[in-house]
């Protein structure tokens, strides 16, 4: 079983974001990507990795008003992971591989093929993009374009990420654009793609100027990128993707006017 650790924070307590790649225990006809709701812990990181090896996984596909969902039940004989959620729902369309097919209301036992633990800051220092306080009458959108380089294939690529909506008066537009091309360059110091909910972009913030004034200095922004692990392996994302820089776009909002 492959196990990976992505460290974006080195203190305690910390938030653990765990993603499991699963295969059906008895026939290997079904594979799933499952992400455990984030939980906060002060356990040594290596202990969390060791304890996850012994977790057993049962998944059941169910029908809900929100569409097909996977009910995940985790169990462990060790009490060390007391803060880890043991039962939760995830979107079946994202979790199931294209070739996988689960019957409804039939519990299925799974083996762990690989897993990844991403270490993030405490929960009060984490922001997901949808949770950032909305702006009244937004006129513009702040987009972060994070550049990455694959050290094996030597290919470079950009990932654009919506950060937040802004209200900017026309007479102040020039000064805001100048800030985005200068000051904000120092606000985002590092970015990394981590396997969670498919893939998640983790951005570290060190400044609260301008567009980032609603965020705490030292916080982390999490932006979900979607279920791309069918095309990209855990090993490739963690070992070979290197963040090379971030640029910013101020886009006129479609709701402005």
Swiss-Prot record:
GO terms for cellular component: host cell cytoplasm; host cell nucleus; host cell plasma membrane; membrane; viral envelope. Gene3D superfamilies: HRSV-S2 matrix protein, N-terminal domain. One of its GO terms (molecular function) is structural constituent of virion. Keywords: Host cell membrane, Host cytoplasm, Host membrane, Host nucleus, Host-virus interaction, Membrane, Viral matrix protein, Virion. It holds the Pfam family Matrix_Pneumo_N. Its main location: virion. GO terms for biological process: virion assembly. It is a peripheral membrane protein. A motif (Nuclear export signal) lies at residues 193-205. It is found in: Virion; Host cytoplasm; Host nucleus; Host cell membrane. InterPro entries: Matrix_Pneumo_C (IPR055461), MATRX_N_pneumovirus (IPR005056), Pneu_matrix_N (IPR043062). Forms dimers. Forms higher-order oligomers. Interacts with glycoprotein G (via N-terminus). Interacts with protein M2-1; this interaction directs the matrix protein localization to cytoplasmic inclusions comprising viral proteins L, N, P, and M2-1 and mediates the matrix protein association with the nucleocapsid. Plays a crucial role in virus assembly into filaments and budding. Early in infection, localizes in the nucleus where it may inhibit host cell transcription. Later in infection, traffics to the cytoplasm to associate with inclusion bodies, the site of viral transcription and replication. During virus assembly and budding, acts as a bridge between the nucleocapsid and the lipid bilayer. Belongs to the pneumovirinae M protein family. This is Matrix protein. It comes from Murine pneumonia virus (strain 15) (MPV). The lineage of its organism: Viruses, Riboviria, Orthornavirae, Negarnaviricota, Haploviricotina. The gene is M.
């Amino acid at each position: 079983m492959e196990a990976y650790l992505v460290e974006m924070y080195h203190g305690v307590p910390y938030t653990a974001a765990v993603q499991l790649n699963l295969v059906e225990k008895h026939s290997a006809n079904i594979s799933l990507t499952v992400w455990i709701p984030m939980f906060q812990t002060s356990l040594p990181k290596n202990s969390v990795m060791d304890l996850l090896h012994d977790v057993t996984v049962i998944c059941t596909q169910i029908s809900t008003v929100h569409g097909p969902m996977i009910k995940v039940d985790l169990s462990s004989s060790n009490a060390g992971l007391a803060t880890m959620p043991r039962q939760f729902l995830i979107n079946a369309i994202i979790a199931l591989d294209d070739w996988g097919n689960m019957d409804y209301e039939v519990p299925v036992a799974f083996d762990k093929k690989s897993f990844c633990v991403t270490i993030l800051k405490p929960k009060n220092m984490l922001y997901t993009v949808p949770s950032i306080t909305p702006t009244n009458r937004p006129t513009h959108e702040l987009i972060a374009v994070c550049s990455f380089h694959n050290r094996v294939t030597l290919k470079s690529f950009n990932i654009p990420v919506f950060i937040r909506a802004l209200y900017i008066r026309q007479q102040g537009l020039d000064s805001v654009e100048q800030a985005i091309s200068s000051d904000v360059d120092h606000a985002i110091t590092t970015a990394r793609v981590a396997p969670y909910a498919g893939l998640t972009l983790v951005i570290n913030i060190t400044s609260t100027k301008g567009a980032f004034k609603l965020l705490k200095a030292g916080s982390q922004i999490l932006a979900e990128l979607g279920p791309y692990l069918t095309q990209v392996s855990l090993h490739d994302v963690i070992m070979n993707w290197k963040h090379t820089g971030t640029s910013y776009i101020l886009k006129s909002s479609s709701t402005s006017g």
